[in-house]
């Protein structure tokens, strides 16, 4: 809701946001919904859009990793994720915020590559354990990620650094900066420590 309120103040009812909210209002009239329908439906649309892009791009990244290797695709996708967070830092308009989410969703489809890498390095007997560890990692991310993001959102860089407003700094830029930091750490670790798990010989040329 806070993100929606912010971009309503910035963009008003014009542009992409106005078009979306206009259709949401029409839907609300038909459904007879009560207060806060805008925020609830808006959040659902953003979350669904991100998940749909993950779903679409997961097989694409997985197929590409079969040809050029897991490490290369992970470097590409984590770089793309970092880019999406950088755009979020400077999302002074709703359109740029949506673009950041679209890019993030597309590159977040690398889950298939990560699980494939685990499958590459585990035996048949230990594969379930390896996949379980992946699940634990995701669970920890879902547990601590929102908590850290909510804490970071209390630091409004647009108020603390008003001279950066022209660059698109917004009330949620601090959370985006934190996300960039974790993403860069991930990227550096992959580049420095992650060894290719898919041997050259069995790779699919097609």
Which residues make up each language-model segment?
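Loop-to-transmembrane helix entry
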Residues: 12-49
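Central cavity-lining transmembrane alpha-helices of secondary-active solute carriers
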Residues: 43-61
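Small-residue-rich transmembrane alpha-helices and their cytosolic helix-loop interfaces
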Residues: 47, 51, 78, 131-139
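Conserved MFS/SLC helix-loop-helix module at the cytosolic interface between two early adjacent transmembrane helices
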Residues: 55-94
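MFS 12-TM fold signature
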Residues: 78-85, 104, 182-186
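Cytoplasmic helix-loop-helix junction between adjacent transmembrane helices
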Residues: 100-138
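Glycine-rich segments within core transmembrane alpha-helices of 12-TM secondary carriers
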Residues: 131-154
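C-terminal membrane-cytosol helix-exit motif in multi-pass small-molecule transporters
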Residues: 180-200
């Amino acid at each position: 809701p806070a993100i929606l309120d912010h971009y309503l103040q910035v963009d008003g009812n014009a542009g992409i946001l106005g078009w979306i909210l206009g259709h949401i209002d029409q839907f609300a009239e038909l459904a007879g919904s009560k207060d806060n329908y805008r925020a609830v439906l808006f959040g659902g649309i953003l979350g669904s859009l991100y998940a749909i892009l993950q779903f679409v791009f997961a097989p694409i990244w997985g197929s590409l990793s079969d040809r050029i290797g897991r490490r290369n695709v992970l470097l590409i996708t984590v770089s793309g994720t970092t880019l999406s967070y950088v755009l979020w830092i400077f999302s002074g308009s709703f359109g740029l915020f949506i673009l950041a989410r679209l890019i993030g969703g597309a590159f977040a489809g690398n889950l298939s590559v990560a699980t494939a890498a685990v499958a590459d390095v585990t035996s048949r007997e230990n594969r379930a354990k390896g996949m379980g560890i992946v699940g634990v990692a995701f669970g920890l991310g879902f547990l601590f990620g929102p908590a850290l993001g909510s804490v970071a959102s209390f630091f409004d860089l647009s108020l603390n650094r008003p001279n950066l407003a022209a660059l698109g700094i917004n009330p949620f830029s601090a959370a985006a900066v934190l996300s960039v930091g974790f993403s860069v750490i991930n990227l550096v670790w992959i580049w420095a420590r992650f060894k290719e798990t898919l041997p050259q010989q069995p790779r699919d040329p097609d």
